[in-house]
Amino acid sequence: MNSVQVRIADWQQDNAELRRIREAVFIAEQAVPPEQEWDADDAEAVHFLALEGGYPIGTARLLADGQIGRVAVLRDWRGMNVGDALMHAVIAEAERRG
């Protein structure tokens, strides 16, 4: 595995990848109803994508109140510190925003 890169994502521009990951993890694996997975917070949240070799493998979001949520890593990349990389990036951004 190459090093995982985490970047801030754009909800509009990166929507397909963000949705693909969350649908795989929350809707398909965890049986979260779609109407509960997608909410109005998505449009306003700061989203993050974890990428390995340029391929999106994980996501998370940061709400305006500082709440971290929707942390998801695709099954094949679990146990490889992708979640750690996401959380470090989200926390750093939350601290930067105050």
Task: List each model region and its residues.
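Conserved acetyl-CoA-binding loop-helix of GNAT-fold acetyltransferases
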Residues: 79-92
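Conserved GNAT acetyl-CoA-binding A-motif
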Residues: 92-98
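Short, basic and Ser/Thr-rich N-terminal targeting/leader segments
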Residues: 44, 55-56, 98
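Short amphipathic alpha-helix that is part of the acyltransferase structural core
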Residues: 1-37, 55
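Conserved beta-strand in the GNAT
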Residues: 49, 54-72
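Short loop/turn motifs at secondary-structure junctions and domain boundaries
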Residues: 38-43
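A short, internal acetyl-CoA/4′-phosphopantetheine-binding micro-motif in the GNAT/acyltransferase core
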Residues: 71-78, 94
